[in-house]
Design a protein with these regions (language model features):
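Structural beta-alpha unit
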Residues: 1-3, 17, 68-101, 108, ...
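Small/aliphatic-rich secondary-structure junction motif
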Residues: 2-51
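Short, well-ordered secondary-structure micro-motifs
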Residues: 21-22, 48-51, 87-90, 113-115
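Active-site phosphate/pyrophosphate- and oxyanion-stabilizing loops and adjacent acidic/basic residues
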Residues: 26, 62, 90, 121
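Short glycine/serine/threonine/alanine-rich loop segments
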Residues: 32-35, 70-73, 129
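General small-molecule cofactor/ligand-binding pocket signal
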Residues: 37-39, 76-80, 132-134
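Short, surface-exposed alpha-helical segments at coil->helix boundaries
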Residues: 51-62
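Glycine-rich, Arg-bearing micro-motifs that act as flexible, cationic patches
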Residues: 100-126, 139
Length: 139
């Protein structure tokens, strides 16, 4: 790793686990001077209500980042078509400055009874950058 702060990508779907991931990533970004990119994946069936939901999600991310002390100019938002795993992999592939991917242990789909959701497991296996999976209730 170089002396330049990396960019941290964090997945956000509005779930409590995703909020914990944003808190963890924002705290790290504030402490290191890194940029923070929040990524929200939008599936085909979600497009109808995306405007209101995306605005609410963006405001939540901005509020959490502000509380952690992240400079507002260092926080960006990306809405990406596709399933959450594909969207996160696409963003990290298209943006070489991203050096860390942060996700919650389970997202909005929640597989009850499992410690990790399918997206976090798949990202841990397939991502080309380090992945931090924030456990439920942490951050």
């Amino acid at each position: 790793m170089t002396g330049t702060p990396l960019t941290i990508a964090v997945g956000f779907d509005g779930s409590p686990d995703a909020e914990a991931a944003v808190r963890w990533a924002a705290t790290l970004a504030a402490g290191t001077g890194a940029d923070l990119v929040a990524v929200h994946a939008v599936g085909l069936l979600e497009h109808a209500g995306i405007d209101g939901r995306a605005t609410a999600h963006r405001q939540t991310v901005e509020r959490i980042a502000d509380a952690a002390g992240v400079d507002p100019g260092r926080v960006t938002w990306s809405v990406v078509d596709g399933d959450p795993c594909s969207a996160m992999l696409r963003v990290t592939g298209e943006r070489p400055e991203i050096g860390l991917l942060v996700v919650g242990s389970r997202g909005a789909g929640r597989h009850h009874g499992s410690v990790l959701g399918s997206t976090s497991l798949e990202l841990a296996e397939r991502a080309h950058v380090p992945v931090t999976i924030v456990p439920t209730g942490r951050a």
